[in-house]
Design a protein with these regions (language model features):
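N-terminal secretory signal peptides that target proteins for export/translocation
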Residues: 1-12
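Bacterial N-terminal signal peptides
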Residues: 11-27
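Extracytoplasmic copper-binding redox domains, predominantly the cupredoxin/blue-copper superfamily
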Residues: 30-247
Length: 247
């Protein structure tokens, strides 16, 4: 019996080449290549905030050689803003789901501070809590949707892992031992979120073409929203500004 000739494309059998092309061009793979990025800035003269006082616990105070900056307003060069959470709040494909990463989001207790101060996590993603200080801390979450937990972490407990089972808007985390310790977290069903460092920059990748509402959040100054339309393989820029409300 005569075998049919096997055509080859760049050394790859045609049947395999066709399969690879089909996978490459399939919706949700080829299309999910757009991004939205930007910079968050503070508009106006920044208010002077008192440094964090840790005198109540000498073990904490000794971990710092000088004043500890208040995290409520974390500014960089040119008044760029850290500790801003940015996410896609509307416009994602209805009914689409995204698997939770197995890589944990980590909250460290270091220098008697929560690091990072602001973060996002996906539903079901591991949430690793570290105690790098060697002093007593506790993690007291204040959600409205997920079950709250209040977990003591003595010096001997260096690590604990949990997760959140439901999506939830930003909520507060505090330490009952050290009242100045504060953090914020939001729980998402999707991976389209980013938290800024003091350079104020954020990037949200892996978006399909469409029009999205993007929200930027600050713990005291509230939210800013913008509508952003992206095309295929598009890179859009959307900046945000925050300011102290006029009295």
């Amino acid at each position: 019996m005569t075998k049919e000739p096997c055509l080859r494309v760049f050394g790859i059998p045609l049947s395999l080449a066709a399969f690879l092309v089909a996978v490459t061009l399939s919706p949700g793979v080829a299309n999910a290549a757009s991004s939205i990025s930007g910079t968050i800035t503070f508009d106006g003269k920044a208010p002077a905030l008192r440094p964090i006082a840790m005198d109540a616990d000498p073990a904490c105070a000794k971990k710092h050689s000088g004043p500890v900056a208040n995290e409520m307003l974390a500014l960089g060069t040119g008044n760029t803003m850290g500790n801003i959470l940015v996410w896609v709040s509307k416009g994602l494909p209805a009914g689409k789901t995204w698997p939770a990463p197995t890589t944990p989001v980590t909250l460290d207790q270091k220098g008697c501070m929560y690091i990072p101060h602001v973060m996002g996590i996906m539903v079901g993603q591991p949430y690793k809590i570290l105690n790098s200080d060697g002093v007593l801390h506790n993690i007291h979450t204040l959600p409205k949707v997920n079950p709250a937990f209040n977990k003591g972490m003595p010096p001997t407990l260096k690590e604990s892992t949990t997760k959140f089972d439901k999506p939830e808007e930003v909520f507060h985390i505090k330490c009952d031992v050290h009242p100045w310790m504060s953090a914020y977290i939001a729980v998402f069903t999707h991976p389209f979120f980013s938290a800024t460092s003091t350079d104020g920059k954020f990037t949200i990748t892996g978006l399909e073409p469409g029009t999205y509402e993007v929200t930027a959040w600050h713990e005291k100054l509230g939210t800013r929203t913008a509508s952003v339309t992206v095309g295929a393989n598009d890179k859009k820029t959307q900046d945000f500004k925050f300011a102290v409300p006029s009295k």
